[in-house]
Amino acid sequence: MAKRSAGILVYRERAALEVLVVHPGGPFWAKRDAASWSIPKGEVDDGEEPLAAARRELGEELGATLELSDLVDLGEVRQKAGKVVRAWGARGDFDPGALASNTFEMEWPPRSGQRRAFPEVDRAAWVEPAEARRLLLPAQTAFVDRLLEVVEPVGQEQ
């Protein structure tokens, strides 16, 4: 059975509609940019409801509890490696400068015997939909398109 993740594509309206995307931490992702960002998401624990997992992961990855409104189900996508991601869109706000992600440990450098901690997310950014499509993992761009079907964009290039 494929691994399952759940996440929330947070959006806000300024001069234009913006969505919140996050960049994975750790050495594997350090020099990657285009097609490597994600919506805040993570694995659904056994017996956990996907929306509860999405809310938990949002808090863990950002290090903050966001007030969300206008929740909308954006469905599922299957990523290249087979993981199934379910997402919701929700209106909210967050200061990327306040990012305080949880961490994970791994051996680094490889075969060194040394374990290091890395943030699960090392950057967060508000971007317009066109930029989100460039930054996000390819399968996740569908969430941006689905969000735009239900949220009226505010004068911007889609």
Regions found by a protein language model. Name each.
Residues 1-39, 88:
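N-terminal strand-loop-strand
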Residues 14-17, 26-29, 45-46, 81-82, ...:
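Short, charged/polar surface micro-motifs in flexible loops or helix N-caps
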Residues 31, 47, 135:
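Residues that scaffold the ATP/ADP-binding catalytic core of kinase and kinase-like folds
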Residues 32-34, 38, 50, 64, ...:
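Membrane-topology and secretion signals of cell-surface/extracellular proteins
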Residues 39-73, 128:
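The catalytic Nudix box helix
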Residues 76-113, 125, 147:
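Active-site-adjacent beta-strand/loop module that shapes the phosphate/pyrophosphate-binding cleft
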Residues 116-122:
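Non-DNA-binding regulatory cores of transcription-related proteins
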Residues 125, 129-158:
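Charged phosphate-binding loop/patch that engages nucleotide di/tri-phosphates or the phosphate backbone
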